[in-house]
């Protein structure tokens, strides 16, 4: 990612995704990528007209039957990328977010594009869901080039939305219940969210995650934050006006007076979130939006290896 941070936005998301994936595969993460992508899985009967590239001729000599070697790269995976696009995801509220200074939504959009490109390389099916105060976008998981173009278009549209134009609260519960029923069973569901919901407890929110698990989905929850200000409340020693981006409520205060108690509250929230994810066998991945895509890509690769 570091070599691409100078690029101004908006620019071609698809091109960016290809560059990141190629760099990831050929760079320091080469071994784990190739480890799962070409690992032998099983034999399957050869069908007339197929390429003879993967025929196991030694097995043919023993059985007088044609079998193809099937690799784990060929084991189809269905993946649904889910993005929380509520108002809190536009934090930090930069006038023009960049890859060098992203907000949570921008990182989610580009991370989703990168993930889709990686899934495409593995011939896995991918779909996209986006929610705010309702389920705004839902595409089924498919493998076609035309479908990939549709998803890129939806991702680009997310970057064009003016966060100041309308306040969008989070309605993850209803959206995830819908997604649970709409996505093919036993899919991998990857959710990008900051887990900010003003009117719902974690217990209430996890009812939807329980639904995902009940329908045999594997879930990776990417918990995005800008830790310096969102968790540690590190600001200059002066009064600020804070605005709740999902309610519009305003409050004036001096952050340094509340930093310790706020940090403790944030840590307790994270601890509770970790316990909930552990309870329901959900992979929780903490993502510092200032540190790029490696954490996200590595988490996916490890999960895929475990699934197959």
Regions found by a protein language model. Name each.
Residues 1-32, 36-42, 51, 181-185, ...:
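Von Willebrand factor type A / integrin I
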Residues 1-143, 188, 192-193, 198-200, ...:
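An amphipathic, basic-hydrophobic helix/alpha-beta surface used to engage anionic
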Residues 66-68, 175-178, 206-207:
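A generic local structural motif
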Residues 75-78, 88-94, 166-189, 221-224:
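A structural preference for long, well-packed, hydrophobic secondary-structure segments
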Residues 106, 166-173, 264-267:
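Conserved phosphate-coordination/catalytic loops
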Residues 110, 114, 170-177, 271, ...:
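Short, contiguous clusters of charged residues that form electrostatic/catalytic patches at enzyme active sites
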Residues 137-155, 280, 302:
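Short, electropositive alpha-helical surface patch
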Residues 147-187, 199-200, 230:
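Von Willebrand factor
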